[in-house]
Amino acid sequence: MRSEEIRPATAADVPAVKAVTDAAYTPYVERIGRAPLPMGADHAANVAAGKVYVTGDPAGGAVAGLVVVEAFADHLFLDSIAVRPDARGSGVGRRLLHFVEAHARALGLPEVRLYTHVLMWENQKIYPRYGYELVGRRVDGPYERLHYRKRLD
């Protein structure tokens, strides 16, 4: 896979999807006191449903990042974004966020929505830089989440 390519994940990608997701979210386990939901996702089912898109490493062809998205009538939900720790700072996350927005536009959807755990401070700095606005804070079971949206032009 070329580094700038973003493509639908295939069944052959499932082990890499799990590995990248686990590597990206493991640092948060201790901070939030439990595994973030993406770590327990049914990656094979998400891939089979066409919800997962992967991209390569700028230094090679292995999966370096991914997004899990789901289309609804009025928005595209960004369920998860994960970048392999050794690929952080290389533009992988930026490319994935731009892809999500382009994908929403291609589907004719007016906005992207997502949430992040309140203790994932890093994300609270990243999303506003890309035009996402905080629209709410909710407790969903054991997870306290900040909800964001980005309206697309």
Language-model segments: which ranges?
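Active-site acidic-Proline motif in GNAT/NAT acetyltransferases
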Residues: 84-86, 90, 118-119
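C-terminal "cap" of GNAT-fold acetyltransferases
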Residues: 53, 110-130, 137-153
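Short glycine-rich hinge loops at helix-strand junctions in the catalytic core
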Residues: 91, 131
